[in-house]
Amino acid sequence: MASRDSANADITPEVLLRAYACGIFPMAESIDDPTLFWVEPELRGIIPLGGFRVASRLARTVRSDVFTVTVNRDFRGVIDGCASPQPGRDDTWINRRIRELYIGLHGIGHCHSVEVWQDDDLVGGLYGVSLGRAFFGESMFHRARDASKVALVHLVARLLAGGYELLDTQFVTEHLRSFGAIEVPRQRYRALLDDALHGVADFGALPVDQPVSGAQALEIIAKN
């Protein structure tokens, strides 16, 4: 279900948080479309944190630490990377207004990024919204093989360490399905969200000022 909003100028980061608490999120038709619309899918994508799967080959890549993974070091770089064309995706829903809103959420501590680096180059990452014990994954990108997958593994480890209960992916793709993503009906999602909003999680339970090793991330996931 989607609905057009006729007063986009009135959407603030605080309004956005209230929308997430109600189970809806904004999108734009394209990067050039100045307007936003609200979305509440009939079937919602989630990754059950206790059922997150890491393929053997990816686990080897994560454990090798061929990439350096950081948190909240370059939020703008990540959202700009997500807004750039990707293989198989020529267009994006991240317009200027979306970018401004989520940078605003980041500024008040409710939106976080995971960056993946190869030497000094940002080669992948993701960003999402944190509210209560729920994390809403917004978008990811990669410029090197497996970079976005490595970001997701590190995100899940951080969510598990921080006491999160819900990882919302909005929709399910085959890529996400390989990690254990499923679709749940709207009413079931609302119940999961309501439960996750009661309580507080800690995105900083793992260090945010220094990289976490791949081995440490995989160990946290394996214990859950």
Curated annotation (Swiss-Prot):
A single GO molecular function term of this UniProt record: leucyl-tRNA--protein transferase activity
GO biological process per UniProt: protein catabolic process
One Pfam family hit: Leu_Phe_trans
The EC number(s) this enzyme carries: 2.3.2.6
Keyword set includes Oxidoreductase: no
Subcellular locations according to the entry: Cytoplasm
UniProt xrefs under Gene3D superfamilies: Leucyl/phenylalanyl-tRNA-protein transferase, C-terminal domain, Leucyl/phenylalanyl-tRNA-protein transferase, N-terminal domain
Entries under InterPro entries matching the protein: Acyl_CoA_acyltransferase, Leu/Phe-tRNA_Trfase, Leu/Phe-tRNA_Trfase_C, Leu/Phe-tRNA_Trfase_N
Disulphide connectivity of cysteines: none
Recorded catalytic activity of this chain's protein: N-terminal L-lysyl-[protein] + L-leucyl-tRNA(Leu) = N-terminal L-leucyl-L-lysyl-[protein] + tRNA(Leu) + H(+); N-terminal L-arginyl-[protein] + L-leucyl-tRNA(Leu) = N-terminal L-leucyl-L-arginyl-[protein] + tRNA(Leu) + H(+); L-phenylalanyl-tRNA(Phe) + an N-terminal L-alpha-aminoacyl-[protein] = an N-terminal L-phenylalanyl-L-alpha-aminoacyl-[protein] + tRNA(Phe)
GO CC annotations, alphabetized: cytoplasm
Keywords: Acyltransferase, Cytoplasm, Transferase
Main subcellular location of this protein, as a coarse class: cytoplasm
Family: Belongs to the L/F-transferase family.
Function: Functions in the N-end rule pathway of protein degradation where it conjugates Leu, Phe and, less efficiently, Met from aminoacyl-tRNAs to the N-termini of proteins containing an N-terminal arginine or lysine.
PANTHER family reported for this sequence: LEUCYL/PHENYLALANYL-TRNA--PROTEIN TRANSFERASE, LEUCYL_PHENYLALANYL-TRNA--PROTEIN TRANSFERASE
Protein name as it appears in the record: Leucyl/phenylalanyl-tRNA--protein transferase
Organism: Rhodopseudomonas palustris (strain BisB5)
